[in-house]
C-alpha cells in the first residue's frame, strides 16, 4: 500500500531537517519545498540537503518576483505598519509560501502539508489558515509543535539519525529574512530592557560606523509602483534589494518593537527594514502631493484593516480582494519622483514632484504672485461656521433641563 505524501515547507535548517525524518517515521513520504523570497538562500544546497535527510522529492522555487509584486507591493501602498512600527516582514511571506505548498500538494497528489512552526508564534496560524482557505481537504501537520522537544533534545535526535547540524546553530537568535526585511528574536532580546547587541543585526550599519556623507537618491513611482532609483529602472524585487543595501549602510530601518502577538502574548522583536521603511516614507510623501483630501483622509481606514488582516493570517479571506481593489484605484495618479537623503539612521524627504501634483504654488504662495481669492474667505467662513453658530445661540438662550 502506497504511503501518504506530505509537502513540507523546508528551509534547510535544523527544525525542518529533523521534521523530514520525523514525518518519515510517522509513515509519510516527504516532499520538501524551499522558497527564496529574498533571503539570499542557496536553493541548490537546500534542494540537495532535503534529499540527503530523506525527502523523496525536493522542489526549490525562486519566488522573489511574485513575492514583491503580489504581496509586498500592496503592503507598501497601504503603508502597512503593524502597531505603527512593524512592516510585516514575516507575515507577508506566509501566504505565498502556503500557496506554493498547496500547489505542489495538488500536483503530486499529497494528502497533507507540513510546516516547522512552534506552538507559540503567529506563523502557525498564518500557515494553517491560509492552507485551509486554499484547499480545505488537505491535512496540516505541525511536527515541531507536536514533538515539543527542547533544542538539546532536537540536536540529540539529529545526531542519532545522522542529520547534518547547521554550522550556525550556536546563533542565539531566531532569524527570518526576506527582501522586505529581517526579523530577530530570542536570546538576550527576550529582555525588553536589554540593548540589542550588534551581532543581532545584518542588514544595517550601527550609527557609529555609517558614512559621514549622506546619499541623496531619487525614487521614481508609476501608479504607486516603485520603478527606478536615480533614474535607473529595476524590477520591483531587485529595486527593494538594492535599496536595502543603499539605506542599510546608513543605518536606516532599525526597529525595536514590543508587539502584541496574535496568540495573546507580548513579544520583543528587533527588525531591520532599510528598503521597506525608505519606500513607505517616500510613497506616503508622493501620495500627500497627489491624492485629493477626501481620499487621503479615508485611505488610512483601509490601510489599517489590510495591515491587521495580513498580520492575523487572513490574506486569503474574502475581504482581501475588496481592500486591494480600493488600493489599486487609489494609486491611479501616484506617479512622480521623491528625493530622499539617507544619513545617520534617517530617511529624510527633501523634495517631491509629479505631473499629477495637486499642489498649486500660485494658490499657496504668500508672494505678490498670489492668485488665491482672499475675499471668498468671508462667505466660506460664514457658511462653514453656521451650524456651530446656531448651536451656540440655542444653547446660550436655553439652559438644558436635567431630569
From Swiss-Prot:
Pathway: Amino-acid biosynthesis; L-arginine biosynthesis; L-arginine from L-ornithine and carbamoyl phosphate: step 2/3. Pfam families: Arginosuc_syn_C (PF20979), Arginosuc_synth (PF00764). InterPro entries: Arginosuc_syn_C (IPR048268), Arginosuc_syn_N (IPR048267), Arginosuc_synth (IPR001518), Arginosuc_synth_CS (IPR018223), Arginosuc_synth_type_1_subfam (IPR023434), AS_cat/multimer_dom_body (IPR024074), Rossmann-like_a/b/a_fold (IPR014729). L-aspartate binds at residues 118, 122-123. Keywords: Amino-acid biosynthesis, Arginine biosynthesis, ATP-binding, Cytoplasm, Ligase, Nucleotide-binding. GO terms for molecular function: argininosuccinate synthase activity; ATP binding. It comes from Shouchella clausii (strain KSM-K16). The keyword Cytoplasm applies. It is an enzyme of class 6 (ligase). Homotetramer. Its EC number is 6.3.4.5. ATP binds at residues 9-17, 116. It is found in: Cytoplasm. PANTHER family: ARGININOSUCCINATE SYNTHASE. Belongs to the argininosuccinate synthase family. Type 1 subfamily. CDD domains: ASS. The gene is argG. It catalyses: L-citrulline + L-aspartate + ATP = 2-(N(omega)-L-arginino)succinate + AMP + diphosphate + H(+). L-citrulline binds at residues 86, 122, 126, 174, 183, 259, 271. This is Argininosuccinate synthase. One of its GO terms (cellular component) is cytoplasm. GO terms for biological process: argininosuccinate metabolic process; L-arginine biosynthetic process; urea cycle. SUPFAM superfamilies: Adenine nucleotide alpha hydrolases-like, Argininosuccinate synthetase, C-terminal domain.
Amino acid at each position: 500500500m502506497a504511503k501518504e505524501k506530505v509537502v513540507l515547507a523546508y528551509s534547510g535548517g535544523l527544525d525542518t531537517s529533523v521534521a523530514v525524518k520525523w514525518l518519515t517515521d510517522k509513515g509519510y513520504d516527504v516532499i520538501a519545498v524551499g522558497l527564496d523570497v529574498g533571503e539570499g538562500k542557496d536553493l541548490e544546497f537546500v534542494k540537495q540537503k532535503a534529499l540527503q535527510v530523506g525527502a523523496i522529492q525536493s522542489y526549490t522555487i525562486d519566488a522573489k518576483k511574485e513575492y514583491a509584486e503580489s504581496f509586498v507591493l500592496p503592503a507598501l501602498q497601504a503603508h502597512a505598519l503593524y502597531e505603527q512600527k512593524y512592516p510585516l516582514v514575516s507575515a507577508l511571506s506566509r501566504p505565498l509560501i502556503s500557496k506554493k505548498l498547496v500547489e505542489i500538494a495538488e500536483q503530486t497528489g499529497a494528502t497533507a502539508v507540513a510546516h516547522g512552526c512552534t506552538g507559540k508564534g503567529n506563523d502557525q496560524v498564518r500557515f494553517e489558515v491560509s492552507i485551509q482557505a486554499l484547499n480545505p481537504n488537505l491535512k496540516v501537520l505541525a511536527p515541531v509543535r507536536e514533538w515539543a522537544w527542547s533544542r538539546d533534545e532536537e540536536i540529540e535526535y539529529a545526531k542519532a539519525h545522522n542529520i547534518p547540524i547547521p554550522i550556525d546553530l550556536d546563533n542565539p537568535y531566531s532569524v527570518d529574512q526576506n527582501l522586505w526585511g529581517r526579523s530577530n528574536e530570542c536570546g538576550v532580546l527576550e529582555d525588553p530592557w536589554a540593548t540589542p547587541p550588534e551581532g543581532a543585526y545584518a542588514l544595517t550599519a550601527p550609527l557609529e560606523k555609517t558614512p559621514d556623507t549622506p546619499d541623496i537618491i531619487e525614487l521614481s513611482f508609476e501608479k504607486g509602483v516603485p520603478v527606478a532609483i536615480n533614474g535607473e529602472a529595476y524590477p520591483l524585487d531587485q529595486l527593494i534589494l538594492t535599496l536595502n543595501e543603499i539605506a542599510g549602510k546608513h543605518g536606516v530601518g532599525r526597529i525595536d518593537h514590543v508587539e502584541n502577538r496574535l496568540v495573546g502574548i507580548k513579544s520583543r522583536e528587533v527588525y531591520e527594514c532599510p528598503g521597506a521603511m525608505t519606500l513607505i516614507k517616500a510613497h506616503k510623501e508622493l501620495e500627500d502631493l497627489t491624492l485629493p483630501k477626501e481620499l487621503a483622509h479615508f485611505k488610512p481606514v483601509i490601510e489599517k484593516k489590510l495591515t491587521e488582516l495580513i498580520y492575523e493570517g487572513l490574506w486569503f479571506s474574502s475581504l482581501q480582494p475588496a481592500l486591494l481593489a480600493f488600493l489599486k484605484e487609489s494609486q491611479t495618479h501616484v506617479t512622480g519622483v521623491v528625493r530622499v537623503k539617507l544619513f545617520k539612521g534617517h530617511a529624510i524627504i527633501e523634495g517631491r514632484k509629479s505631473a499629477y501634483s495637486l499642489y498649486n504654488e500660485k494658490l499657496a504662495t504668500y508672494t505678490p504672485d498670489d492668485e488665491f481669492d482672499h475675499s471668498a474667505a468671508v462667505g466660506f467662513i460664514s457658511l462653514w461656521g453656521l451650524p456651530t453658530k446656531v448651536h451656540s445661540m440655542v444653547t446660550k438662550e436655553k439652559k438644558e433641563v436635567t431630569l
